[in-house]
């Protein structure tokens, strides 16, 4: 049986292998109970970020309803290493549990890694860089990109595009990890020639560009290099956007600022009465 094809169909296919007896010699698909101190953190966990608020909510749910889905663990000396379910394990400790339901499977490193990645992908728990690093870990285990795609049930292009994120400059990776730019922004940076990627990243941050504007930076850079005139128009930087919001709140109408060093301020009104109200707010009194 191909482990990769089984994993590609999901965890259920792996955990209920056809013809496999249930729970022999303390391992298998039978749910058992282990003391929580005998359960160890995963050697490789694709998910790097566990939000404290989310863990606290899960801990409260566990206090009220218990752990509804057992952890998957594998023997490691006198302990058992988590393969799938680390978030439940962390939350159970917060909830004060002393025992946890588990399924014990004798798994090799690569198979354990594949299962951990598939579980997180099925739950949509991984950030873009966590997903890319997880694929890279499978490559490091000896799989090629096609093998990784089969193992996790994704298209090869999905795996390839995710791995490309790892080629970004370190400041971009750090910003993506911190959430200060989106994966779509990062992919827009990837469309730039390698020498221009840091420049594009700084433009996105300093000018507050949206994804569409970030994608257009390649044309802007090309136009400047070839002397083809002024750069494309983009939205005002973040400071202007904040000013738009402040003026909109003050006047009670939509305000739009275009341009940077030079430009215009537009105020919208829907009636003569609304115009009079805006003029009064601005301190202008029309002559009778």
From Swiss-Prot:
Q: Which GO terms describe its cellular component?
A: chromosome
What are the protein's GO molecular function terms? DNA binding
- SMART domains given in the database record: ParB (SM00470)
Q: Name one GO biological process term.
A: chromosome segregation
Q: Known Pfam families for this protein? A: HTH_ParB, ParB_dimer, ParBc
**Keyword Protein biosynthesis recorded:** no
Q: Which residues form a coiled coil?
A: none
The alphabetized UniProt keywords are:
Chromosome partition, DNA-binding
DNA-binding: present as a keyword of the record?
yes
User: Which cysteine pairs are joined by S-S bonds?
Assistant: none
**Superkingdom, natural source:** Bacteria
**Which PANTHER family does the entry mention?**
CHROMOSOME-PARTITIONING PROTEIN PARB-RELATED
Family classification: Belongs to the ParB family.
Query: What function does this protein fulfil?
Result: Involved in chromosome partition. Localize to both poles of the predivisional cell following completion of DNA replication. Binds to the DNA origin of replication.
| Record-given protein name | Probable chromosome 1-partitioning protein ParB
Q: From which organism does this entry originate?
A: Deinococcus radiodurans (strain ATCC 13939 / DSM 20539 / JCM 16871 / CCUG 27074 / LMG 4051 / NBRC 15346 / NCIMB 9279 / VKM B-1422 / R1)
Gene behind the chain? parB1
């Amino acid at each position: 049986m191909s482990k990769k094809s089984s994993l590609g169909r999901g965890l259920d296919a792996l955990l209920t292998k056809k013809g496999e007896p249930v729970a022999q010699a303390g391992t298998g698909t039978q749910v058992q109970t282990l003391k929580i101190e005998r359960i160890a953190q995963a050697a490789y966990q694709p998910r790097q970020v566990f939000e404290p608020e989310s863990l606290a909510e899960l801990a409260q749910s566990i206090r009220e309803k218990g752990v509804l889905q057992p952890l998957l663990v594998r023997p490691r000396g006198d302990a058992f290493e988590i393969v799938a379910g680390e978030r439940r394990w962390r939350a159970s400790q917060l909830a004060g549990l002393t025992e946890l339901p588990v399924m014990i499977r004798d798994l090799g490193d690569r198979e354990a890694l594949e299962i951990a990645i598939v579980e997180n992908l099925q739950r949509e728990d991984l950030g873009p860089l966590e997903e890319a690093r997880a694929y890279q870990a499978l490559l490091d285990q000896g799989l090629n990109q096609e093998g990784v795609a089969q193992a996790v049930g994704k298209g090869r292009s999905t795996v390839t595009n995710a791995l490309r994120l790892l080629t970004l400059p370190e400041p971009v990776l750090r910003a993506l990890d911190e959430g200060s730019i989106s994966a779509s922004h990062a992919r827009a940076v990837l469309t730039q020639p390698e020498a221009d990627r840091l420049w594009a990243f700084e433009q996105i941050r300093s000018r507050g560009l949206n994804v569409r504007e970030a994608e257009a930076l390649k044309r802007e850079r090309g136009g400047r290099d070839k002397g083809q005139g002024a750069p494309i128009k983009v939205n005002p930087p973040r400071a202007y956007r904040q000013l738009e919001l402040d003026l909109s709140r003050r006047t009670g109408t939509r305000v739009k600022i275009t341009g940077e060093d030079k430009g215009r301020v537009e105020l919208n009104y829907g009636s003569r009465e609304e115009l009079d109200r805006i003029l009064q707010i601005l301190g202008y009194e029309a002559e009778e």
